[in-house]
Amino acid sequence: MSDIDHLQQIAHLRREYTKGGLRRRDLTETPLPLFERWLAQACDAKLADPTAMVVATVDEHGQPYQRIVLLKHFDERGMVFYTNLGSRKAHHLENNPRISLLFPWHMLERQVMVTGKAERLSTLEVVKYFHSRPRDSQIGAWVSKQSSRISARGVLESKFLELKQKFQQGEVPLPSFWGGFRVSLEQVEFWQGGEHRLHDRFLYQRDGDGWKIDRLAP
């Protein structure tokens, strides 16, 4: 059987979800403690990149785009990630701050989806995080004009070596085009795989100063 024949069998690829359910008694009054518990369990399970999340934004024509970004902080104010401010996602968020995040913890048969609005972080927050990064990562932030077209990888590697030489003494300065966003928590949905495709879904939705919690059909 050829590779193409194998690929044509994808309609038959499936498995049962058997790792447990999510019941109302398992829920917390607000979504953050449950998210924190699930994230800790994802870390304890040694999942690859447990803080990786799909970030979805929309351009001026209504075309959605997605990419994987790492969560770097979260609290009651929202979820934080950092990026090049000249990137496609940053331009999208300037025009339309609506955003969706998705944490796909496949091995635990779980996912968490967050929807809200993104706002730029303060310079103080960005500087503090930037200088906590490995030095080579700080230099790497200077190298790439994110999402621009380049002729070859060698262009990036040459620029990296040039800047590494330039910044060999003292601190690497924060690029003016590098920053971060905080995503407000307006809706948070928890999904747990269930047997016979009877998955458990609970939606937390802002309701004044509190949260409304609904079970959703799978």
UniProtKB/Swiss-Prot annotation:
* UniProt source species: Cronobacter sakazakii (strain ATCC BAA-894)
**Keyword Flavoprotein in record:** yes
User: What is the uppermost EC class here?
Assistant: oxidoreductase
**An annotated Gene Ontology molecular function:** pyridoxamine phosphate oxidase activity
What Enzyme Commission number does this protein have?
1.4.3.5
Q: Name the PROSITE patterns for this protein.
A: PYRIDOX_OXIDASE
Q: What does this protein do?
A: Catalyzes the oxidation of either pyridoxine 5'-phosphate (PNP) or pyridoxamine 5'-phosphate (PMP) into pyridoxal 5'-phosphate (PLP).
Q: Which residues bind FMN?
A: 67-72, 82-83, 88-89, 111, 146-147, 191, 201
What Pfam families does the entry give?
PNP_phzG_C, PNPOx_N
HAMAP family hit by this protein: PdxH (MF_01629)
Q: Could you tell me the Gene Ontology terms of the biological process aspect for this record?
A: pyridoxine biosynthetic process
Q: Does the keyword Manganese apply?
A: no
Q: What is this protein called?
A: Pyridoxine/pyridoxamine 5'-phosphate oxidase
Q: Pathway of this protein?
A: Cofactor metabolism; pyridoxal 5'-phosphate salvage; pyridoxal 5'-phosphate from pyridoxamine 5'-phosphate: step 1/1; Cofactor metabolism; pyridoxal 5'-phosphate salvage; pyridoxal 5'-phosphate from pyridoxine 5'-phosphate: step 1/1
What catalytic reaction does the record list? pyridoxamine 5'-phosphate + O2 + H2O = pyridoxal 5'-phosphate + H2O2 + NH4(+); pyridoxine 5'-phosphate + O2 = pyridoxal 5'-phosphate + H2O2
Give the family this protein belongs to, as stated in its UniProt record: Belongs to the pyridoxamine 5'-phosphate oxidase family.
Question: Which cofactors does it use?
Answer: FMN
